[in-house]
Curated annotation (Swiss-Prot):
Pfam family, one: Flavodoxin_2
Residues involved in FMN binding: 92-95
Name by which UniProt lists this protein: FMN-dependent NADH:quinone oxidoreductase
Family that this chain belongs to: Belongs to the azoreductase type 1 family.
The protein's Enzyme Commission number: 1.6.5.-, 1.7.1.17
Cysteine pairings via disulfide bonds: none
Role noted for this protein: Quinone reductase that provides resistance to thiol-specific stress caused by electrophilic quinones.
Keyword set includes Nucleotide-binding: no
Subunit structure: Homodimer.
Record text on cofactor binding: Binds 1 FMN per subunit.
Amino acid sequence: MSKVLYIKANIKLEGVSRTFQVSDHFIEEYKKQHPEDEVVVLDLYKENIDFLRPEDLEAMADINDETKKNTTFLKYAFQFAEADKYVIAAPMWNLGSPAILKAYFDYITITGITFHYTAEGPKGLLQNKKAVHIVARGGEYGNAPYEMGDRYVKTILGFLGVSDIQTIAIENLDIIGADVEAKVKEGKEKAGLVAKEF
């Protein structure tokens, strides 16, 4: 049995968010194919993920039984490390991802939990895991330099040791005359195919 962490990083409501329309469909199809797996939903806005404070940095520098017990945000790092698969639903906002997703990655990028330092430099501890990033974009931003959200997600996951990473992107949703319904439907179809093999 695998544990799937479904990370939702969008303040828009269910049914309104085009990203969530596709990511929720992905999860539905995944559950059909993998009924024995556990899916844990983590809505970053409902969790009130915040920016790191000075005391958080101090706790990161000295992780022991006391800091594990008294440092609330560390639970997210342990939760992330314990998952086998990650579904990250985050739209493109202003060429990147919502700031709350970056804040979340700051919570979970913890020495000794998700990566560590070796004589050769940092090494990710999250080996043999896989991820899919589902993103809706207003225009066509699939390539650099304007696209910085998906590239960041892939880079930070790679830093943590996750090497099997896919992207499901729904683009050109805000272009004048775009058939948004058809594009979302196309995104759902792609999501369904990826979910079967995920």
